[in-house]
Regions:
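Residues at the C-termini of beta-strands that transition into short coil/loop
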Residues: 34, 55, 92
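Structural detector of well-ordered beta-strand residues that form the stable sheet scaffold
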Residues: 7, 29-31, 49-52, 89
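Short, charged, surface-exposed secondary-structure boundary motifs
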Residues: 39-43, 60-63
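Hydrophobic alpha-helical
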Residues: 1-42
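Hinge/cleft segment of the Venus flytrap/periplasmic-binding protein
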Residues: 58-114
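Sec-exported extracytoplasmic/periplasmic mature domains
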Residues: 1-2, 18-26, 44-48, 65-72, ...
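Short beta-strand elements at the ligand-binding edges of bilobed clamshell
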Residues: 45-57
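Electropositive phosphate-/nucleotide-binding environments in soluble metabolic enzymes
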Residues: 11, 54-57, 61
Length: 114
């Protein structure tokens, strides 16, 4: 069957897919992960449909907080799994994401919202 969309494991991979698709005259939604500033530009320019912000800084901070509490006094997390809500960034909420990146808070606070 024909390929109708591509979800890449990272924005860097999505950039490569976009170049190959464009060189071959193919148009389809391409989605990456990481919310790199270059991905926001690619979304604005119509070369990438979306990126997903996963907040790696918040992931590592949360993991370290859990580890340090356990090492300090044996405190275990209330829940076995800790979930952070990723944000899908598209043209619809791109302005919010760009403002957050400009302010330097995209990864620290998770502010790009629809």
């Amino acid at each position: 069957p024909p390929v109708t969309a591509i979800v890449a494991a990272s924005d860097d991979m999505a950039f490569g897919v976009s170049e190959v698709a464009q060189a071959n005259g193919l148009t389809m939604p391409i989605i990456g992960f990481d919310a790199l500033p270059e991905a926001l530009i690619a979304i604005r320019d119509g070369k990438q449909a979306a990126t997903i912000e996963q907040f790696p800084g918040q992931q590592s901070t949360t993991a370290m907080d859990i580890l340090l509490a356990f090492l300090a006094d044996g405190t275990e997390p209330k829940e076995h799994d800790t979930y952070l809500e990723p944000i899908l960034i598209t043209k619809d909420n791109l302005a919010d994401a760009e403002r957050a990146v400009e302010a330097g808070v995209a990864q620290a606070e998770g502010t790009p919202t629809a």
